[in-house]
Amino acid sequence: MRAVLTVAAAVLAARPVAADPTESRVLTAPTAWLPPSGAATATLGIDHRGDTAVFAGASLDGLAELEIDEDSDVRGCTDCAMQRTPLRLGRAGFRIGAHQDWLHGMPALVLGVRATFAAYEPAVDAPRVTDAYVVASRDLGVVRLHAGVDALAASVADHRSAAALRPLAGVELHPPMYPRSSLLGDLAWEPELDAVHGPVLRWMLGIGVRYQAFSWGSVELAVRARQGDDLGGATVMARFNAIARR
């Protein structure tokens, strides 16, 4: 019992990793962290297949954030039993929320929405994805926890799906002996756009590490597995995150 109390005290008392850029996502799952007033964020990523991702965000007085990104997280197919093709989509989002301890003991809370505004050389006709989510995040020192719910809707060709609720979860572990390093894990969802049968939601599990290389930037290396893929279908990716403060 004494050992359990000692570990619990260490978790609650340990200081968070210093100078950590304010990340709006763990790996794929969103967080409730918002950048400080006047800050701008950017992420550049590439995976082992050569697919790239670009993200940019701008703070609105520290209470909200505008986002724009281009990635290939969504898959599309005309015969999903044979091949699922990454779809490069441009998406824009808006997030608004409250910071941690706005009321004593309260986690950070964010309401976010995101919608497709462009599709680049899509393998299927008229792909679109829209989602709205609520996420709570809490910094406990060596551990940061994230939990929420996502309402996703998608359409492809003449098929449209109604919004469906799915859980979101994430964890960041900051070992005190490695103050610049973090272990990351999350659960998120993206649609598979089947041009024949319509959209289907698929879970994505991610695990990775983040290294705080600079006070303004961090490097991530991660592996993501997607529902329906075998081990060879897992994605290995590297990302660089940066934040500019006013």
Predicted regions and their residues:
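Repeated loop/turn-to-beta-strand initiation elements of outer-membrane beta-barrel proteins
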Residues: A39-T41, G62-I68, D101-L109, V142-A147, ...
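Membrane-embedded beta-strand positions in outer-membrane beta-barrel channels/transporters
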Residues: T41, A53-F55, R91-R95, Y133-V135, ...
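Outer-membrane beta-barrel "beta-signal"
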Residues: A92-F94, Y211-Q212, D230-R246
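Outer-membrane beta-barrel domain signature
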Residues: A29-T31, T41-G45, D79-T85, A119-D125, ...
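Outer-membrane beta-barrel biogenesis signature
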Residues: R15-T43, E172, P176, S181, ...
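Hydrophobic h-region of N-terminal signal peptides that target proteins for export
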Residues: V4-A18
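Outer-membrane pore/translocation modules
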Residues: I68-L165, A169
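Transmembrane beta-strands of outer-membrane beta-barrel pores
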Residues: I46-G50, L60-G62, I68-G76, A98-Q100, ...
